[in-house]
């Protein structure tokens, strides 16, 4: 065990001023944090006599930014002092927190700017605040002993006062998110006559053409070829050469071949598009895993943060294998990211839909345990989900969604998909129990709609997490599915399980309402339907 060092003392007058501001603004924000509608409405009316709720939220977020800067400074100081004695995993955990705190400041500044804008979009701001709450959860996960039971390289315990700062940031964000819900107005769901469209509106006409066109007809900006016939031989070099903070599409063509590298697209690499030669032809492969000392957040073969990322005709593979525990093939925290005809190949934790709004069309996802997980608002449409053969004695869970508050507009929606056994599981599927999902956090939300569910799924359908955790607060729903595994006669009887019986309830999880697909998918060029 590494000794815990005290956090460096700050000048007393700075602490006094900061605490004064904190107590004042926390008082304002907690006034509207009650879950009682009548109480909230009454207090909101009183507060808006002097300040509008957006102004209160801005004040709360500016306070939160101060706290994030304090947390970042303390994490950095602590990392510097402890670095020689930290394990590789512990260094990863510190790096994750510092990076996520930087992302937190970036997203909060965007939210403040948006709240001051005349074209205020409450849905976008709700998503930003939810993203930031997810960053705090991810930071603390890295230091959680319960999440690191696969090996013994987590010997350092984060000081309680630093944990409290992160939790306090989350509480502030929770208050802000709830205040936002008080004044936001949901857009009406599209009518059935309006949803049968080919593309969502957040994809531009140019991006639509890019996705429809064969690669030889695509005007790409850079090319990568392992045989030396492109601009670069590695994907990382091409990403480094791409512009920062681009507002227009930047296309990187990755010629067929196997590329053995871990690729990270930071937040500044926006509007990047990867185009390959097809599943199994353009393959990006690596093998980082939790067992080998990497944090789950750093295991991805490809990780993306910059907004507007698109991938087409590529295989993303983590080849660590079933014995290596968490080993992510792809991680997306890219808002308005979209994937078309891609493959995600791994075992445990294959596809990390970490945060923001995402869309997957005609993709193949392979895995064993929790192989689609995270807290994005994500829709899988016309895709195939394959359970692979796990280690002996393990149970298969297709999803592990991590929504942490009822106000968060996140969840996993599986629409018009196929839920199947992979070829290696088919001969032995009677030896393993497979489930549609299990809860990662208290308000976990996953729905299966108009999909084919094969006979590998256990009649109960869904798997408990730890004992009775989240069984009353989760939202797991099924609607108009087909196949031998779709029979709900013996499904779980948890309070949070829904046998969805009307189209209105199911419609809220389609592309239009759930990820605001009408506002951004058109620009990606990926075919989609806003409704069923």
From Swiss-Prot:
Disulfide bonds: none annotated. Residues 221-518 are annotated as: Pectinesterase 39. Keywords: Aspartyl esterase, Cell wall, Cell wall biogenesis/degradation, Glycoprotein, Hydrolase, Secreted, Signal. Residues 35-169 are annotated as: Pectinesterase inhibitor 39. Expressed in siliques but not in flower buds. GO terms for molecular function: enzyme inhibitor activity; pectinesterase activity. One of its GO terms (cellular component) is extracellular region. The active site is at residues 349, 370. The record marks 348 as: Transition state stabilizer. Pathway: Glycan metabolism; pectin degradation; 2-dehydro-3-deoxy-D-gluconate from pectin: step 1/5. It catalyses: [(1->4)-alpha-D-galacturonosyl methyl ester](n) + n H2O = [(1->4)-alpha-D-galacturonosyl](n) + n methanol + n H(+). Glycans are attached at residues 62, 74, 85, 172, 221, 231, 244, 287, 382, 404, 502, 522. Its EC number is 3.1.1.11. Substrate binds at residues 296, 326, 438, 440. It is found in: Secreted, Cell wall. Residues 1-34 form the signal peptide. Its main location: secreted. NCBIfam families: PME_inhib (TIGR01614). The PMEI region may act as an autoinhibitory domain and prevent untimely PME activity during transport. In the N-terminal section; belongs to the PMEI family. In the C-terminal section; belongs to the pectinesterase family. Acts in the modification of cell walls via demethylesterification of cell wall pectin. This is Probable pectinesterase/pectinesterase inhibitor 39. It comes from Arabidopsis thaliana.
